[in-house]
A protein has these predicted regions:
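Cystatin/cathelin-like cysteine-protease inhibitor module
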Residues: 15-124
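Sec-dependent bacterial lipoprotein signal peptides
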Residues: 1-15
Length: 124
């Protein structure tokens, strides 16, 4: 019984972090998307990585600013100096162009470990 309660508690913590990550991504999209009709259609699991170095982060940030989906003045958070680890979540977005045609995007959002900012975005 205690074991089941422990698993339930761990699952709720994980779901809470995933929900916080999703909300952070939604807020980022709302603030920085150039198109007025961008919606999230699917959200993957929250995971972590230590394989994204600072030069990759800089390149991903530049790609986003020049890619057309987000505003050129998009602001990103910074990776904390005391860790190489970032959280990551894969998201499927849907946009509509001026003709009303839907276009899907699959993106990976890299987040700081405290879930306070988006550090980089990669279009898959």
């Amino acid at each position: 019984m205690f074991l089941a309660a422990g698993f339930l508690a761990l699952a709720s913590v994980g779901c809470g972090k995933r929900h916080s990550a999703k909300k952070l991504v939604e807020n980022f999209i709302d603030e920085h998307a150039q198109l007025s009709s961008v919606s999230i259609t699917d959200v993957g699991k929250l995971d972590s990585t230590d394989r994204v170095d600072n030069s990759t982060i800089n390149a991903l940030q530049a790609d986003v600013k020049n890619g057309g989906l987000y505003k050129p003045d998009t602001k990103f958070g910074q990776r904390p100096a005391n860790t190489k680890t970032l959280l990551m979540i894969r998201v499927t977005l849907e946009t509509k162009d001026e003709k009303g045609e839907k276009k899907p995007y699959k993106q990976t959002f890299y987040l700081d470990p405290e879930l306070t900012s988006v550090v980089a975005v990669k279009t898959n």
